[in-house]
Amino acid sequence: MRYDPGLIEEKWQKFWKNEQVFKAEEDETKTKYYVLDMFPYPSGAGLHVGHLIGYTATDIVARCKRAQGFSVLHPMGWDSFGLPAEQYAIRTGTHPRETTEKNIANFKKQLTAMGFSYDESREFATSDPEYYKWTQKLFLILYEKGLAYMADMAVNYCPELGTVLSNEEIENGFSVDGGYPVERRMLRQWVLRITAFADQLLEGLDELDWPESVKQLQKNWIGKSSGASVNFATEHGAIEVFTTRPDTLIGVSFLALAPEHPLVDLLTSDEQKAVVAQYIKETQSKSERDRISEMKTKSGVFTGSYAKHPVTHELIPIWIADYVLMGFGSGAVMGVPAHDERDLLFAEQFNLPVVSVLNEEGVCINSCCEGFHLDGLSGEEAKQYVINFLEENHLGAAKIAYKLRDWLFSRQRYWGEPIPIIHFEDGSCRPLRDDELPLLPPEIQDYRPEGVGQGPLAKVREWVQVFDTETQRAGKRETHTMPQWAGSCWYYLRFCDAHNSAAPWAKEKEQYWMPVDLYIGGAEHAVLHLLYARFWHQVFYEAGIVSTPEPFKKLVNQGLVLATSYRIPGKGYIYPETAKEENGKWVAPSGEELDVRQEKMSKSKLNGVDPQILIDEFGADAVRMYAMFSGPLDKNKLWSNQGVAGCRRFLNRFYEMVSSDRVKEDNNFEGLSLAHKLVQRVTDAIEKLSLNTIPSSFMEFINDFVKLAVYPKSAVEMAVRALAPIAPHISEELWVLLGNSPGVQKSGWPSVLPEYLEEQTVTIVVQVNGKLRARLDIMKDASKEEVLALARESASKYLEGCEVKKAIFVPARLVNFVV
């Protein structure tokens, strides 16, 4: 019989849908397992090969766990708010909702074609009013706890996009989306007080089964540092400086302030005002990431003022430097060029003194003056001495600082959750009541922003202006919207109870499903989505509305998918199919030599692969199998369409084997042993997420199994059940072909019996006068006489014409003939 995925895959996809095979149930008699993908933004580009790696991995685990008797929750939804749909609306006039719905429909079609086993009954999009009603409600919980507030903030503002951007949305002073110039501005913004949970966020990492690299990234992002605050007196008040190295205080040769520091105007002398103003203007075009990037030179400008050193009382020049950020410490640093590489670059750039106060062993030197004696001290002893001195003289104190800053939450966009707040003229505001949610945005035609710092909602006067019946006052709705991160902060909780109209989730359902047992997604979310979701979850935990302190028990980051790219140097990329190899070199159709590399798949590099084309040619099961076979889940991997073809050939062989007339009711030990060993290897691989080893295990199995004269039916059925998580369509077809009722998952996961895992043969060595002459595979229970006879036969040419004086027999190890 012939294997034709085009005939069987759609059939089984309809069966799963009609039978609701993947519908999750809160069954208290079963152990739960919650396996989740980082849900996608439904872009117009649709599903790409990078999605396939993570989605196939979670699907394999979900299918295996269901077969093993777990109650499995494996859902999918859509992170559907965001800037791309809004920018498309500005260009075309198409409502973002229309674009989003179209893209979601395309994504769903592609996911279905891959045979992923999602519980479709729990599907939602973050842009559904039924969903963001609860996003708004959860925001108000943060607001009521004092964790959401408004403040004037220095932000990255893109005039062309008309909105605030995060550091991650900027590259080299330009927006990632569109490549428009970005500048720094002070704007009134909504902010979430994530810093209030800095310690909990740090401590919680210790309990998580996450990649160490991700945990370290979050630790660095939070950036907890112990040190001291030091006050440097000036004519206009003290400058507070935070330092982690108070032991180097005597080595200070300059102070550097952030351009946004509140004392800059007061400290700038008349002679320096023009150059300082120009420097600050230039700084406004840089993102914070650009400002702190490693560079061989540092920029800065002198204020014309000096501060008094708290110990030596010497005058220290005060500079402005863009590498100093207001968000960390106090927005001022003490420059110690001899013991800080960044300070040294700055000092060399502007010819400032370099004073060494530590020797090579880290012991203080040149650090004594009246009433202050550091020489000879080192490490914590020196730091504590300085802190004690500062505190006793009211010049500073011990302090803990964090790099983490409160989360800028406002966006000047239309396509986002409206913030459910009414403002009044006296500066007060009122959060909307539950019965006023969801707050829907108005239908508009013009999606362009309204002036600096105002989103398109500000233009809809009839929506903005309201008479508040609760306070009997005229008010204005908030016109900022939430960032795309808001909806993804809690979506995993909504999946527990996706269509509850009375609450974001029912307590008993959250208690049953949480935490997420396995969460798979890209490492690029390490310090944004993952940190923000943990923050919201810990707020909810303190509020008593979730039962676990952390949302995601185990995290796995899938590696990048690479593909070969072909580029004409100085001109650009060409399509791979147009490149050809001549005389050991790759050339373009024009004859120009190509730069050939393995790079991340992307549209810009023309090396992307459309999964649907692969499905149409090879079938979804072959694509799924190769997605795992291509390399370890967490490592980068090079994609090869030839590899997909190879997996298709394997599935052809497997289909032929199962449909062969050699499949019979038989208890052949060797066949059963091969099947039990296969199941054991597959089970272990899924448990360890070593999914790339599974195709190899099947290939080894089939190579040995087809050598049998008879294929034991029970062994074949075990192999089909073990293949089902990886290649579900062909497994369903073969399961029925073997005479079983539809639904291979219902048959359970095959049990492995120890007696079939034990090797039934041993290899012994055959020697003549101590020299190796042969190796012999024998049954473990063979008698001494049988072994000696077989050994004599295998070494017969070395024994010919010789008298065997003695045969030394060591069971299961060797036979040595002495002649």
Curated annotation (Swiss-Prot):
Subcellular location: Cytoplasm
Residues spanned by motif 'KMSKS' region: 600-604
Catalytic activity line of the entry: tRNA(Leu) + L-leucine + ATP = L-leucyl-tRNA(Leu) + AMP + diphosphate
Entry's Gene Ontology molecular function annotations: aminoacyl-tRNA deacylase activity; ATP binding; leucine-tRNA ligase activity
Predominant location: cytoplasm
Protein name: Leucine--tRNA ligase
Short motif ('HIGH' region): ranges: 40-51
E.C. number: 6.1.1.4
GO biological process entries: leucyl-tRNA aminoacylation
Similarity section: Belongs to the class-I aminoacyl-tRNA synthetase family.
UniProt enzyme class: ligase
GO CC annotation, single: cytosol
Chain sites annotated for binding ATP: 603
Pfam families the UniProt entry points to: Anticodon_1, tRNA-synt_1_2, tRNA-synt_1g
Organism: Chlamydia trachomatis serovar L2 (strain ATCC VR-902B / DSM 19102 / 434/Bu)
Keyword Cell membrane: no
NCBIfam families, alphabetized: leuS_bact
InterPro entries assigned to the protein according to its UniProt record, in alphabetical order: aa-tRNA-synth_I_CS (IPR001412), Leu-tRNA-ligase (IPR002302), Leu_tRNA-synth_edit (IPR025709), M/V/L/I-tRNA-synth_anticd-bd (IPR013155), Methionyl/Leucyl_tRNA_Synth (IPR015413), Rossmann-like_a/b/a_fold (IPR014729), tRNAsynth_Ia_anticodon-bd (IPR009080), Val/Leu/Ile-tRNA-synth_edit (IPR009008)
Keywords: Aminoacyl-tRNA synthetase, ATP-binding, Cytoplasm, Ligase, Nucleotide-binding, Protein biosynthesis
Tagged with keyword Cytoplasm: yes
